[in-house]
């Protein structure tokens, strides 16, 4: 399962991902298994035991949603875990501790000095063997991690493997949207770093008609294209090197790229920041940060949404957590909701964007809110 949920003060802040897997869990329990073992990661402990990333706070929320007790084990592999699982009875539900507390899950760890350390292949093999020993068949309901070559995804060696209901629902939505979209097809990308979204941008250029690039990652594009001063805005040096390549591909494919033309800037990231509007010509002065789309950009984005019949959105347009930098993302969501009501298909993904949708109480106003995205 993908129970990689945000925590606050030791409690689950947003249970969406847990709720997503409840139908699969209930279906399995209806079959009267001897036991059901749930495994997940939470955050990025980088192969080390980091208490703030423990799965333990998930237990009360999971018990509440299922209406039954859940047993928590403080590790995910090893003799004690194997014994506890072996002795389970009467459909007992067991939640394992964070898989990523072990370097063998991701194949690497980060040591105290901040260096990447490759996991020992023999240890990885043992880790996978221990996970495999915990069950007789394997169900993958973790859409958010299904693309990763991690031990829990690819190393659990059971002849019977199945997709859970959540994974199926996600794949059905995405395959329809990506393989036979109603056109025009618009993708909206935001967030901080270009390099994190290179593969996504490249693959979407092959499929879409228009692409909005906003949020922090837009400034790397604008600096490369217009040599624009971006002040203290986010800049991705690695991403900068491949902007030309991405734009050339878009041009060759006839994909229209929309970048911001003006920006709401702040002199800090905080709620009490002073604000100014800047544009492509003025650039952003030193000491100022582009934190949201400006009014002209908001209007241009609205026009692009109004033309679209399929919309996939991953990544906010600004620092929406602060009210004064929320309008670009909130207005875009309003436009996407209206377009959905008029018959368009809309898919929202990525942790931050999903948070925005929930805060704006718009979950029912878009076609599908994906559990994918995030760490």
From Swiss-Prot:
ADP binds at residues 191, 215, 320. Keywords: ATP-binding, Glycolysis, Kinase, Magnesium, Metal-binding, Nucleotide-binding, Transferase. GO terms for cellular component: cytosol. CDP binds at residues 191, 196, 215, 315, 320. Mg(2+) binds at residues 192, 196, 352. ATP binds at residues 192, 197, 216, 290, 321, 352-353. Its cofactor is Mg(2+). It holds the Pfam family PGK. Pathway: Carbohydrate degradation; glycolysis; pyruvate from D-glyceraldehyde 3-phosphate: step 2/5. Monomer. This is Phosphoglycerate kinase.
């Amino acid at each position: 399962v993908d129970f990689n949920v945000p925590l606050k003060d030791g409690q689950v802040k947003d249970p969406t991902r847990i709720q997503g897997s409840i139908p699969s869990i209930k279906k399995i329990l209806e079959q009267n298994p001897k036991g059901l073992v749930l495994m997940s990661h939470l955050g990025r402990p980088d192969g080390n035991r980091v208490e703030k990333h423990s799965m333990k706070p998930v237990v009360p929320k999971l018990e509440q949603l299922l209406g039954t007790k859940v047993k928590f084990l403080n590790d995910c592999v090893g003799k004690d875990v194997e014994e506890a699982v072996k002795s389970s009875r009467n459909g007992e539900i067991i939640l394992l501790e964070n898989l990523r507390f072990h370097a063998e899950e991701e194949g690497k760890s980060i040591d105290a000095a901040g260096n990447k350390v490759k996991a020992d292949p023999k240890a990885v093999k043992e880790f996978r063997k221990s996970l495999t020993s915990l069950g007789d068949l394997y169900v993958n309901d973790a859409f958010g991690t299904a693309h990763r070559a991690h031990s829990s995804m690819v190393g659990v060696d059971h002849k019977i493997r199945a997709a859970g209901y959540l994974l199926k629902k996600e794949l059905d939505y995405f395959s329809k949207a990506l393989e036979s979209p109603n056109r025009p097809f618009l993708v909206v990308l935001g967030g901080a770093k270009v390099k994190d979204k290179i593969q996504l941008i490249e693959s979407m250029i092959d499929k879409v008609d228009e692409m909005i690039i906003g949020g922090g990652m837009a400034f790397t594009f604008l600096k490369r294209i217009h040599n624009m001063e971006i002040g203290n805005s986010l800049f991705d040096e690695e991403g900068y090197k491949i902007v030309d390549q991405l734009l050339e591909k878009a041009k060759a494919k006839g994909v229209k790229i929309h970048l911001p033309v003006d920006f709401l800037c702040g002199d800090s990231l905080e709620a009490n920041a002073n604000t100014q509007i800047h544009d492509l010509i003025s650039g952003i002065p030193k000491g100022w940060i582009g934190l949201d789309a400006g009014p002209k950009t908001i209007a241009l984005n609205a026009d692009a949404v109004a033309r679209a019949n399929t919309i996939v959105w991953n990544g906010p347009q600004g620092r929406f957590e602060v009210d004064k930098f929320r309008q670009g993302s909130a207005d875009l969501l309003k436009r996407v909701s209206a377009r959905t009501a008029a018959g368009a298909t809309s898919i929202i993904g990525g942790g931050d964007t999903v948070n925005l949708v929930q805060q704006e109480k718009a979950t029912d106003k878009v076609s599908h809110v994906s559990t994918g995205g995030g760490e």
